[in-house]
Regions:
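Cyclophilin-like peptidyl-prolyl cis-trans isomerases
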Residues: 3-211
Length: 211
């Protein structure tokens, strides 16, 4: 039958690209699954991780109830108190927006500067902590942004929380599968507002690809 033909074809697809990464910090380990629906961001992150690009960089911007941000190459060995966040790799990644991929707690997302196509930084990322929302708040959000959430997405924002105001504005390209407690621990560190919300004690990372 034709059904069996399609099954046979499926089997011969090329080996799946790696899509799991691990971020190790003094606060513990965060495991992240990169989404296949955002292949440009997935492949770029894997490439940088394999090159060791992120090793020794910091979570340089941390805001409790919002997110933890990292991936600035200038944060390696940066003197204490130096504001960070301008370092880059010299290219951007085209936005890969998908209404199914939301800024729930634990979402891995691409940072970016203001630009008309909302292209992502080639290296800087953030992991969402966020807060929980009520139905009324989500209704207002939908009116403001024009986004319509599914009942399942609403449940996520009501129960686990996130940052829905960033949806379809910044590319979401992965999610934490283990170590949400580590995200919470990092989000709670003491920060220096004058240095762009940089943690007072450096939060260094190493990132490796889990093959």
């Amino acid at each position: 039958s034709t059904f069996q033909v399609s099954l046979a074809q499926k089997k011969s697809t090329p080996a799946k690209k790696p899509s799991m990464v691990q971020i190790t910090t003094d606060y513990g380990t965060i495991k992240i699954k990169l989404y296949d629906e955002t292949p440009k961001h997935r492949d770029n992150f894997i490439k940088l991780a394999k090159e060791g690009f992120y090793n020794g960089t910091l979570f340089h911007r941390v805001i409790q109830g919002f997110m933890i941000q990292g991936g600035d190459p200038n944060s390696k060995n940066a003197p204490a108190g130096q504001p960070l966040g301008m370092g880059d790799v010299g290219y951007t990644v085209p936005a890969e927006f998908n209404p199914a991929l939301i800024h729930k707690k634990g979402a891995l997302c691409a940072a970016r500067t203001e630009n008309p196509t909302k292209a992502s930084s080639g290296c800087q990322f953030y992991i969402v902590q966020g807060k929980t929302y009520t139905d009324a708040e989500l209704d207002q959000m939908e009116m403001r942004t024009g986004i319509k959430y599914t009942p399942a997405q609403r449940e996520i924002y009501k129960k686990s929380g996130g940052t829905p105001f960033l949806d379809m504005n910044y590319t979401v390209y992965g999610e934490v599968t283990e170590g949400l407690d580590v995200v919470d621990k990092i989000a709670a560190v003491q920060t220096n507002r004058q240095a762009g919300d940089r943690p007072v004690q450096d939060v260094k990372m190493t990132v490796k690809v889990i093959e």
